[in-house]
Amino acid sequence: MDKVLTHDAVINDLSSGMTIGIGGWGARRKPMSLIRAICQSDLKDLTLVSYGGPDVGLLCAHKKVKKLIFGFVSLDMIPLEAHFRISRQNNEIDVMELDEGMVQWGLRAAAMDLPFLPTRVGLGTDVLTHNPELKFVTSPYSDEENLVAMPALNLDVALLHVNKSDEKGNTQIVGPDPFFDELFAR
């Protein structure tokens, strides 16, 4: 079965209101041709999960984003992506700003088909103040430690940029990669 799709075919498989994970990290290894195709489409009210960069900025500039779940939105040398900043300051998008590790745990929970994963990440930070929907669990063991119950970040689809792929859907990322695209893809 040939899994090669055109940009138009990908866009036709997406629908407004979806939760879309976008791989890469900041400005690196983003599926920008697909992002541009979404910008030119009728899609709207998207929830994005991303370690954001120009992907988030373009989608915010084109009013495609309803909610953003993120660990950061940066262009590396430029610490804050400008279109995202404007959208956020003008309350044009809902945000769930998390610690980078919390995004990772949310993607891991979804990859393992679990409702949440317990973690210490975020304890003692304002992340919990700004996200009152996050819950806590108590360890059932003798320490009875109170932990964050990071909910699964379930995606409808993930958009990734890889170095190599084939018609069977196999992909390869060349070189050391500290990113979490394999979690987006599960």
Enumerate the predicted regions with their spans:
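Conserved alpha/beta enzyme-core scaffold
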Residues: 1-186
